[in-house]
Amino acid sequence: MATPHINAEMGDFADVVLMPGDPLRAKHIAETFLEDVREVNNVRGMLGFTGTYKGRKISVMGHGMGIPSCSIYTKELITDFGVKKIIRVGSCGAVRMDVKLRDVVIGMGACTDSKVNRMRFKDHDFAAIADFGMVRNAVDAAKALGVDARVGNIFSADLFYSPDGGEMFDVMEKYGILGVEMEAAGIYGVAAEFGAKALTICTVSDHIRTHEQTSAAERQTTFNDMIKIALESVLLGDKE
């Protein structure tokens, strides 16, 4: 039945949901890559759709910006609608010079300055990691598509406009962080808490060092390699 944030019924969502932050990107994914699409959520404009990809039922829905927003939607999808796998498909900023604009980054783990996972884990550090099988399938899908995806740690920040002055970016670069975004650590924590599986795949939308960036329109429509990797990885997962 419907929740406070999702006006769908059990069965409206597939067991796998792709989740961009932007609901308009969710609409673009559904209209571009899925067949037999129907809208399954529109509460607060957070659009959700279900359709098929090469005959496989798949859903896509926005999760908003930041860990609090994405945690609400992922929790409800898992506990109220039977979703088993979440794949975040979003954008990230690069801090390393060897990571380039539009590179695809697969988030094997997610560091964070948020305290949400410590709240879940009785004030202990929680290793927020993606499901290994989903990582492997995404890597294999990327190779099959000829995409040189990067795999490693990303950083989920609570603040988009940080007062830090850039010092933390130096630390991230030293520790090999591939990209900075705002949701993965929270999604991995929710998945662990409620027995689901999760993965984050990002496209580098801007570079913190060089100040290169993609436009909002590009972020909505041109990150197709990332979406193809996510969709093909679902099909690979079905063969396991």
Curated annotation (Swiss-Prot):
Q: So what does this thing catalyse?
A: a purine D-ribonucleoside + phosphate = a purine nucleobase + alpha-D-ribose 1-phosphate; a purine 2'-deoxy-D-ribonucleoside + phosphate = a purine nucleobase + 2-deoxy-alpha-D-ribose 1-phosphate
Q: Where does a purine D-ribonucleoside bind?
A: 5, 181-183, 205-206
Q: What is its EC number?
A: 2.4.2.1
List GO BP terms, alphabetically: purine nucleoside catabolic process
**Which GO cellular component term is one of those annotated?**
cytosol
Known InterPro entries for this protein? DeoD-type, Nucleoside_phosphorylase_CS, Nucleoside_phosphorylase_d, Nucleoside_phosphorylase_sf
Site residues, Important for catalytic activity: 219
What keywords were assigned to this record?
Glycosyltransferase, Transferase
**Signal peptide range in chain numbering:** none
Extract the GO molecular function terms from the UniProt entry. Answer: purine-nucleoside phosphorylase activity
* HAMAP family from the UniProt entry: Pur_nucleosid_phosp
Q: Which family does it belong to?
A: Belongs to the PNP/UDP phosphorylase family.
Subunit note: Homohexamer; trimer of homodimers.
The free-text function statement in the UniProt record for this protein reads:
Catalyzes the reversible phosphorolytic breakdown of the N-glycosidic bond in the beta-(deoxy)ribonucleoside molecules, with the formation of the corresponding free purine bases and pentose-1-phosphate.
Q: What name appears for this protein in its UniProt entry?
A: Purine nucleoside phosphorylase DeoD-type
Q: Which organism is it from?
A: Enterobacter sp. (strain 638)
